[in-house]
Amino acid sequence: YMQILSGKLIERFPNRIINIHHSFLPAFIGAKPYHAAYERGVKIIGATAHYVTEELDAGPIIEQEVARVRHHNTISELVQIGQDVEKVVLSKAIKYHLERKVLVVKNKTVIFY
């Protein structure tokens, strides 16, 4: 969790390592997206599950979801709302992966629902 994997490890398991990122990528990459979202005054926050590549937070996207937030939400509230969204997104991504419903084409995915 919150670790950057070596290129060697990623190469050994292409499209088999899933990352959950706590923002609706490509917005707010990096380690503190909820803080960045709060500072920008966003109206929605989200989560993205994607396959890990050597480029940080840039792998093929498997699943995404968003939740509406309001101007009075604190950073702590954004984190809590976001964590709830992350659970849903990660569980769907794992399910699709295990059921072999994900086709990777270059840096995009096709999901067979």
Residue ranges: model-predicted function:
Residues Y1-Y113:
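Donor/substrate-binding cores of folate-linked one-carbon enzymes
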